[in-house]
Amino acid sequence: MSVWNYVVTAHKPTNVTHSCVGNFTGPQELNLIIAKCTRIEIHLLTPQGLQPMLDVPIYGRIATLELFRPHGETQDLLFIATERYKFCVLQWDTEASEVITRAMGDVSDRIGRPTDNGQIGIIDPDCRLIGLHLYDGLFKVIPFDNKGQLKEAFNIRLEELQVLDIKFLYGCPKPTIVVLYQDNKDARHVKTYEVSLKDKDFIEGPWAQNNLDNGASLLIPVPPPLCGVLIIGEETIVYCSASAFKAIPIRPSITRAYGRVDADGSRYLLGDHNGLLHLLVITHEKEKVTGLKIELLGETSIASTISYLDNAFVFIGSSYGDSQLVKLNLQPDTKGSYVEVLERYVNLGPIVDFCVVDLERQGQGQVVTCSGAYKDGSLRIVRNGIGINEQASVELQGIKGMWSLRSATDDPYDTFLVVSFISETRVLAMNLEDELEETEIEGFNSQVQTLFCHDAVYNQLVQVTSNSVRLVSSTSRDLKNEWFAPVGYSVNVATANATQVLLATGGGHLVYLEIGDGVLNEVKYAKLDYDISCLDINPIGENPNYSNIAAVGMWTDISVRIYSLPDLNLITKEQLGGEIIPRSVLMCSFEGISYLLCALGDGHLLNFVLSMSTGELTDRKKVSLGTQPITLRTFSSKDTTHVFAASDRPTVIYSSNKKLLYSNVNLKEVSHMCPFNVAAFPDSLAIAKEGELTIGTIDEIQKLHIRSIPLGEHARRISHQEQTRTFALCSVKYTQSNADDPEMHFVRLLDDQTFEFISTYPLDQFEYGCSILSCSFSDDSNVYYCIGTAYVMPEENEPTKGRILVFIVEDGKLQLIAEKETKGAVYSLNAFNGKLLAAINQKIQLYKWASREDGGSRELQTECGHHGHILALYVQTRGDFIVVGDLMKSISLLIFKHEEGAIEERARDYNANWMSAVEILDDDIYLGAENNFNLFTVRKNSEGATDEERSRLEVVGEYHLGEFVNRFRHGSLVMRLPDSDVGQIPTVIFGTVNGVIGVIASLPHDQYLFLEKLQTNLRKVIKGVGGLSHEQWRSFYNEKKTVDAKNFLDGDLIESFLDLSRNRMEEISKAMSVPVEELMKRVEELTRLH
């Protein structure tokens, strides 16, 4: 790998951090707006559910997301503040269907200590000001003028230092905040302040409340007519206002999120740390509060946000499990729950650990993650591409084409599968045992190759061969009519739909027929300048059985043309360029947009937007799908039409957000595909591969596939052992009932195909699993699982005791073979030259696997070690080199010296980085992630002139990822095909707290320089949402310094080139002096890295 790295997201963040509801896209439209840390999604509430409208990246980690409506506005605006102290106000532009920036700014202060409890951003309900609590002891005010525009910000001193929450109160003549804080004796109180915009200061507020519940952590301001505030504690809930005080006890719980149900604020939904959803009701007589009631509704994912939508629909956003759309029912179900889950939205966060495995054994990596937390813990199997689930298969050599036919026009299912060979045609059908067997359609000519078949109107079937077109009854299967090719000519290309047939005979002759009841009419004939290579009349206009236009691909001038039907007049001619002929053309419609797809003989695909009214072709784009000729066919899955491109690299073409996407199919070469929708296997596909025909159903159409294995407990570490086909986990189960020991820790063994627990080893009380490894030792052919643990005692700051456990898998059971006590937590385990390397608190320890003195079994024996770390948390090895990521002392490089049998330090990075993960890219370059969401690389300086130079790891790359990385692993999510340009590029995968799976690819220097130039040009063309700067966002940032990113490129920005309109692509092409086609090809190739 190299110094020049490309960072790209394979799976976007899914951890929902904020959500809000309001009329953002229109005065009458109700929107749910969701923040996923560095992205926002805008949804529209429709009778059918939530409809996505926009999903955009934000160049910052979102700290505040609030809707508000200044005076004189008919719809809401969106206020966003980021963790790096930028803010913006966004407005919906209905014309362009995108967000525009109303205001933006920077609210950082030169001095000031960032708050420990996170940033707070709030908006006065009467839109007089925005309040921000970003630094201890300061409250920042951004006032509005009377036109709703923002004025200059100022700070007010806030004497409460340990602030837990701040909200604006409703119904106050002057803007008033309520502050929940903790004093230096750990008691909690609430205070109110009026904000005087004139004096730029606080005035004592109308009331205060001292000595609340010790767990009070959340304020909920109550709107008029009641006003006042709810204070949510761990054991009590209090309603407080200038005139009233009401309190009720609750079962001990930590409330994580709330959502207001009614506009008058009399009912609230509360979500706690166990995922229990309660309804809190304020009882009142007119405007006088009489009491509080709380009722358990049921269980959801552990909520980080709750947004009440409408008509009892509620969005539950989660950071520890899947987010949900739920409905609250008036009557409980059989389990007593009022909560009904309607939709689940996958969330991989937090990814605490993962491993890369090839479970299908087909050369493609899958990532198995430890995802979620507490009761929502799960394993997720993530793989790229679309799988085909095989239902039936038969051995057949030399298939030249396939079509499915029905036995009647209105039959919902297909009956026949016509399979064409070089000198015959066979007809297959499903028998009663759901097996494929051969049958006959008497009216078909089975002694010759079929060029095309189709269902036709009036319960007919049409078969085109080289010398005729046959029209056959689908009920009696008899021949009804036949059209013969003129003497001396034979048909070489043909296509048909339910009412039309278009065919080409040699010499550029084009013949158009129409199908009647028992008749074939030759309607029109035309002579073209060159031979015809491919045809399509797939009806995508108003009439599902008739097309007004035909697409024709030509030899010699290498063009694609659009002709009118029935008169065969030329409407459009598009030169394709190059020397490779079009092999397959297809007109299709995705999300209401008509396209012409044109596949070439060398694996390239062109797509154009096709105007149905004028036949015009625009917005030309070219991608490389494979290296062999491609054939295109449409198919349906879940009531949506997609296109299957069969070739040496089969691909499904689909559309999302009106953009064409390409997802590889997990099959080796496919020569032909056709939909085969039979009753036994609905929505199936027939697929011809080398020597066999397979019938199978297709996965959901998306780029990444995620399978969930709910565990009901939190998996913290995972390892795979290929020899035993198992996974081993370190996991923790949280029990609510048993208060003495709320956590139980286990080592669990899972089958790698079924993912069922097959064996469990419970750890001791207070013992945590910290690390896990599958390895073998010198002079021992067995494969073992080694587990590193720590005893976490309540009274100790740092564990002083742990164990290393060595297990073998026998008959699907974990057998403990050896254990070794340690003087601290075993944070990391690595296989090292046939020995075991452990990181234990501040030291690195090497163990050998040796026979015991009694000569019987084996044990771990200490060989040597190395002190000198604060806490050695992350370790990677390569050869004799050991790279250590320290709690706070960045990265150091150690070496094991065989002769002396000792480990010594060779070099270190002298910066203070608090590490979260490390990986070795190559002999000299090491990658690190740290707790300010940055990535960096360091280089070993073996050529240094002095010892001092050689002892320093030089920082060579820096980048702000904006994500907390928990683990790096070498590997790839995609099939590595040696013939592709990216086949040789080494990659590292990472997993983050927000559920991001990312890829870091090391590039050759010339490619890096080219892409760096492209990135610079893209920054000028693509502006960040809210005016946020991409350059600032990607700059390495911690408490001590901010420096521009270097030797890292943002793949997400680079790949967004493919979403640009043609004229913006041309703008970039001009600036780079590189043709658009070339830019698209180079960026397309990169998308194949993930």
From Swiss-Prot:
GO biological process, alphabetically ordered:
protein ubiquitination; red, far-red light phototransduction
Origin superkingdom: Eukaryota
Q: Give the metabolic or biological pathway.
A: Protein modification; protein ubiquitination
One term under GO cellular component:
nucleus
What coarse category fits the chief subcellular location reported for this protein? nucleus
Task: Tell where it localizes.
Answer: Nucleus
* Molecular function as annotated in GO: nucleic acid binding
The entry's keywords: Nucleus, Phytochrome signaling pathway
**Listed InterPro entries:** Beta-prop_RSE1/DDB1/CPSF1_1st, Cleavage/polyA-sp_fac_asu_C, Quinoprotein_ADH-like_sf, RSE1/DDB1/CFT1/CPSF1, WD40/YVTN_repeat-like_dom_sf
What Pfam families does this protein map onto?
Beta-prop_RSE1_1st (PF10433), Beta-prop_RSE1_2nd (PF23726), CPSF_A (PF03178)
The entry assigns this protein to a family as follows:
Belongs to the DDB1 family.
User: Which proteins does it associate with, and in what oligomeric form?
Assistant: Probable component of the CDD complex, which probably also contains DET1.
* Name of the protein in question: DNA damage-binding protein 1
List the top taxonomic levels of the source.
Answer: Eukaryota, Viridiplantae, Streptophyta, Embryophyta, Tracheophyta
